[in-house]
Amino acid sequence: MSHKFLEPIKIGNQTVKNRVMFLAMAKNISNFDDSVSAKDIAYVESVAAGGVGLLVPGAMIVDPEWPSVLPLQPGIYDDRFIPGLRRLVLAAHKYDAKILFQLWHPGATNYSGIDPKTVDELTKDEIHAIQDKFVAAAKRAMAAGADGIEFQTCHGYLACQFISPLFNHRTDEYGWNKVEDPTRFA
């Protein structure tokens, strides 16, 4: 008897060998300079060797100017990280697994000692600058050979702060004036 989850699936222009996915989790094993560590590579390789079709190794920092709520995560905010990120891709591809890079920004959720309720609302220029950082990070993911990207939109981090009416009290085009407005950030 064949199980559907063991059959290949096409996602966009990618064919994933099965429907078993290993999704992102914080591991806190990258180097202190935000570069990919040997532990990161070993982790991806062990997950891929287990037979998953697609894996997301975890949150990748797109903006080093914001304090990280998740210490020791890999950076994707500078070209110097591309060689290490490429090693993650090769570790997954060695076992015919696809790999997506999760692009992440903490927003007001951080360990800086600042209460998230007191963080100033981003200006439109700041929003555009952060959007540009996401675009640059996506280009680095592709340069490293990643099979795709995932835009981190949960757990109260920056993207979630735009799409959730619990966080988003803006009155401009990024607020909740119309249902599509909060999605403008993405």
Regions of interest found by a model, annotated:
Residues 1-186:
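Flavin-dependent oxidoreductase catalytic cores
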